């Protein structure tokens, strides 16, 4: 080996020109000397607001990395209690670990920029001040180099700080980057440009914006049509991002001792950027004009891009192209001059492009905007903006926020639409209008004659089922959720009248009916009353005092039989339903041998029972009981309420109607209003807070609103998520309050939002709109938003304040909910003047159907 090395050296010396002289000093290293690692030179990071560079450095040592790796293996694992405690603190946003908190705070501030108007000037200015993650000015002002081919590796590198103002290459609008063209220097590369291109992009993970559900569905359908696997396409797809953080970490490590100061060449751009307003492309999608410029300029790429970059060599050197400083998007009012941008695609030597691009219409279809904290959709409608100066810490919190996918919004909207369609298809549509609908017809009554009867039904202007059908489906209705005193007294009065009734048998034996003595004709019929009538049976040797009952007698019923010790009581209201009689056709008992013309029928929604004919019961849309003979043998409230049977037939217990009614709607129009609200306001807020927080606020606000409505409007069937929607509106106020310090005109935004909510409350004073659910849902949603809706913090003191705030508002909400439960179940109240909060009687009959002293039919 030594001889071969000596031969090669001698051959090289023979080829060396006589005029070339190389003096290479020999390095002498002793045996005991430990080789020292030379730390990399610190690179100067330039900020906008600083005239002098700030030095930041990294020191890397292989030995220290090995030691740190070994130490990490012996770290003690945290206990389960600490893990649960830390996870709970992270979920509420009060953890000591600043990563999760800062991520949420950055997202919150970004969301604020689209909802509540312009920010204060100092806030926007502070957002543009240097922070720990801003990209260095050198990397933004120095053009990137062209890649040096392998055949030219031996040539010298040239530092070219004046390489500006040359031709540009075009970047696709998907990436949105604008980078100046590198001057073409044959066989050379700019060292300053090379390190500038590596400044921030190599160390920051290129996180791409999450795709929408529609875009993923479109890609999956395309993969199925082409016969390819969706996973294969996902793995083959390169990692990209649709936006770039507003700053990068300014710590660069270079491999050479010299460093250039380019702040002089960036002075004009710094002055121009300081005068610009805060309008970031992070919050917006690319405009149509920009997309068209991209397509029109792709034809001239070959003349501007220079030589193509070899893909394998480019990956080896980890060359990444920097961003144009600021990556601002010009407002539509003042169109910017056209720029020729650098194409960020990695191109092979033969000129082929990597991957394919979706067409312009598809790009526009799937373009998604990120929701800035404090602004959002409502902020766009009210022209809300940030201040001009925002603290860099607050700005960092906004940038770290990611939009959540509105899974809960899509799920609840799908459920609402599906249930509404099924309800309309099964129960039909009630008469449409705002008044009462009357139907008159001639119907066979219980006395065997035809009579003109009238059926009154409440109209439904929402184009949906009737109130009785909505109660069957699970509407909020107090008599089905507790034992209502008025309904219970009505049933007791009916039982008292029935206890003193008897069977009225016509003289011609053509029919019989259970009535009182006043309703039985003394000339055409006989009122078989015990013990005056000779057909009275005995009970323990004593004549029975109550009876008789048409088609039911203890002596003729065999199942259940009236035998000792299970004899039927003297009180006929406690008699059971007889399911089997004696087979004899003639018993010589007038109330048994007659033809019965009326049986119990449950009519209305208040538990009213009548013994009438089947024809009349069907006309009144009641529930006819063919098997019973007395109203005391049936439970009308069980028929009216439906759903699961009561545990105790005399005590309604369907408390689950408080949240079941949130999924129902009064009609098609009602469902459309909810869908519009949820796909705009609810979807926008869920992007900010996530499905779990929004679902908690949505459901708990709706339950609280329904509970208050059940207290003050007990006899009115209510459906729909009115309380939930006003609880979501309360989230807008909480978000505005938390973003107060960064808004330019917070009082103006508050006034606009307050006017909208007051208008909705005033709209609730009209008939068929429950204002009690609106008010209670708004108050509960306000408390829950302070507890469950995290926000940006402005220091350590603000974090401690939030911890106290979470506890206080949770306690207040629990106290409010407990108070409503006590008023509903323990101490029911009857408020006479409360009806003015839900309906103002402009005329005598305007609020008749909403009277809290409901008429019990």
Curated annotation (Swiss-Prot):
Start and end residues of each stretch annotated as Disordered: 283-307
GO terms for cellular component: endoplasmic reticulum membrane; Golgi membrane
InterPro entries linked to this entry: Inactive_Rhomboid, iRhom1_2_N, Peptidase_S54_rhomboid_dom, Rhomboid-like_sf
Keywords in alphabetical order: Endoplasmic reticulum, Glycoprotein, Golgi apparatus, Growth factor binding, Membrane, Protein transport, Transmembrane, Transmembrane helix, Transport
Cytoplasmic topology ranges: 1-413, 683-693, 738-748, 796-805
Any one Gene Ontology molecular-function term assigned to this protein's record: growth factor binding
Glycosylation sites: 585
TM annotation in the entry: 414-434, 662-682, 694-714, 717-737, 749-769, 775-795, 806-826
Primary location: endoplasmic reticulum
Topological relation to the membrane, as annotated: Multi-pass membrane protein
Highest taxon above the source species: Eukaryota
Localization in the cell: Endoplasmic reticulum membrane; Golgi apparatus membrane
Presence of keyword Phosphoprotein: no
Record flagged with keyword Cell membrane: no
Sequence ranges on the Lumenal membrane side: 435-661, 715-716, 770-774, 827-857
Compositionally skewed regions (Basic and acidic residues) per UniProt: 290-300
One GO biological process term: regulation of epidermal growth factor receptor signaling pathway
Pfam families per the UniProt record, alphabetical: iRhom1-2_N (PF12595), Rhomboid (PF01694)
Function of the protein: Regulates ADAM17 protease, a sheddase of the epidermal growth factor (EGF) receptor ligands and TNF, thereby plays a role in sleep, cell survival, proliferation, migration and inflammation. Does not exhibit any protease activity on its own.
Family, as annotated: Belongs to the peptidase S54 family.
Name of the protein described by the UniProt record: Inactive rhomboid protein 1
Record gene name: rhbdf1
């Amino acid at each position: 080996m030594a001889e071969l090395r000596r031969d090669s050296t001698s051959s090289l010396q023979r080829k060396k020109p006589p005029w070339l002289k190389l003096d290479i000093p020999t390095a002498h290293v002793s045996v005991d000397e430990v080789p020292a690692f030379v730390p990399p030179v610190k690179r100067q990071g330039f900020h906008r607001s600083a005239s002098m560079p700030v030095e930041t450095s990294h020191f890397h040592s292989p030995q220290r990395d090995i030691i740190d790796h070994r130490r990490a293996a012996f770290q003690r694992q945290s206990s389960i209690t600490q893990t649960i405690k830390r996870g709970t603190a992270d979920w509420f946003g009060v953890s000591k670990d600043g990563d999760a908190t800062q991520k949420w705070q950055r997202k919150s501030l970004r969301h604020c920029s689209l909802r509540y108007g312009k920010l204060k000037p100092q806030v926007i200015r502070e957002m543009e001040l240097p922070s720990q993650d801003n990209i260095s000015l050198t990397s933004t002002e120095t053009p990137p180099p062209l890649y040096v081919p392998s055949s030219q590796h031996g040539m010298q590198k040239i530092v070219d700080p004046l390489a500006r103002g040359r031709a540009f290459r075009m970047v696709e609008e998907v990436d949105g980057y604008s980078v100046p063209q590198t001057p073409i220097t044959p066989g050379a590369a700019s060292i300053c440009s090379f390190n500038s291109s590596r400044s921030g992009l190599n160390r920051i993970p290129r996180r791409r914006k999450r795709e929408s559900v529609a875009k993923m569905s479109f890609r999956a359908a395309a993969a199925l049509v082409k016969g390819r696997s969706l996973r294969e396409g996902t793995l083959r797809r390169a990692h990209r991002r649709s936006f770039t953080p507003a700053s990068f970490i300014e710590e660069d490590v270079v491999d050479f001792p010299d460093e250039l100061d380019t702040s002089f060449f960036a002075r004009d751009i710094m002055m121009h950027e300081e005068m610009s307003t805060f309008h970031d492309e992070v919050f917006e999608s690319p405009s149509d004009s920009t997309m068209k410029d991209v397509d029109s300029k792709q034809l001239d790429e070959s003349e501007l891009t220079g030589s193509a970059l070899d893909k394998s060599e480019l990956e080896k050197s980890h060359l990444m192209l920097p961003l144009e400083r600021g990556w601002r998007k010009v407002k539509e009012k003042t169109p910017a001059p056209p720029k020729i941008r650098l194409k960020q695609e990695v191109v092979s030597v033969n000129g082929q492009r990597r991957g394919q691009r979706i067409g312009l219409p598809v790009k526009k279809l799937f373009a998604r905007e990120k929701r800035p904290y404090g602004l959002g959709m409502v902020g766009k409608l009210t022209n809300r903006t940030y201040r001009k100066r925002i603290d860099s810490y607050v700005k960092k919190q906004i940038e770290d926020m990611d939009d959540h996918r509105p899974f809960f919004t899509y799920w609840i909207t799908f459920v609402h639409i599906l249930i509404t369609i099924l309800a309309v298809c099964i129960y039909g549509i009630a008469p449409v209008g705002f008044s009462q609908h009357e139907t008159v017809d001639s119907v066979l009554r219980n006395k065997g004659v035809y009579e003109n009867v009238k059926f009154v039904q409440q109209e439904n202007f929402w184009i949906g089922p009737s109130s009785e059908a909505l109660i069957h489906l699970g509407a909020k209705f107090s008599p089905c959720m507790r034992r209502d005193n008025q309904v219970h007294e009505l049933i007791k009065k009916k039982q008292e009248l029935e206890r003193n009734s008897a069977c009225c048998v016509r003289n011609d034996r053509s029919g019989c009916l259970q009535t009182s003595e006043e309703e039985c004709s003394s000339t055409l019929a006989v009122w078989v009353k015990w013990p005056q009538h000779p057909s009275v049976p005995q009970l323990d040797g004593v004549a029975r005092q109550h009876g008789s009952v048409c088609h039911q007698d203890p002596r003729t019923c065999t199942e259940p039989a009236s035998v000792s010790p299970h004899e039927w009581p003297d009180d006929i209201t406690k008699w059971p339903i007889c399911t089997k009689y004696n087979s004899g056709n003639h018993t010589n008992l007038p109330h048994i041998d007659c033809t019965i013309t009326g049986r119990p029928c449950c009519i209305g929604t208040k538990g009213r029972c009548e013994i009438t004919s089947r024809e009349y019961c069907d006309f009144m849309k009641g529930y006819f009981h063919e098997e019973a003979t007395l109203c005391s043998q049936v439970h009308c409230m069980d028929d009216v309420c439906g759903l699961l049977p009561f545990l105790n037939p005399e005590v309604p217990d369907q408390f689950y109607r408080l949240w079941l009614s949130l999924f129902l709607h009064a009609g098609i129009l009602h469902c459309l209003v909810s869908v519009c609200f949820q796909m705009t306001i609810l979807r926008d807020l869920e992007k900010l807070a996530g499905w779990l927080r929004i679902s908690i606020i949505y459901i708990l606000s709706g339950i609280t609103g329904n509970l208050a409505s059940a207290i003050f409007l007990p006899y009115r069937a209510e459906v729909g998520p009115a309380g939930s929607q006003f609880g979501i509106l309360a989230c807008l106020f909480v978000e505005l309050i938390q973003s107060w310090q960064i808004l330019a005109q917070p009082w103006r935004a508050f006034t606009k939002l307050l006017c909208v909510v007051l208008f909705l409350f005033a709209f609730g004073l009209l008939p068929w709109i429950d204002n009690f659910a609106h008010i209670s849902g708004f108050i509960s949603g306000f408390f829950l938003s302070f507890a469950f809706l995290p926000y940006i913090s402005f220091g350590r003191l603000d974090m401690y304040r939030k911890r106290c705030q979470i506890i206080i508002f949770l306690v207040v909400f629990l106290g409010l909910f407990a108070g409503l439960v006590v008023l509903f179940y323990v101490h029911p109240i009857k408020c006479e003047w409360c009806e003015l909060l839900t309906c103002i009687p402009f005329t005598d009959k305007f609020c008749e159907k909403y009277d809290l002293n409901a008429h019990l039919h």
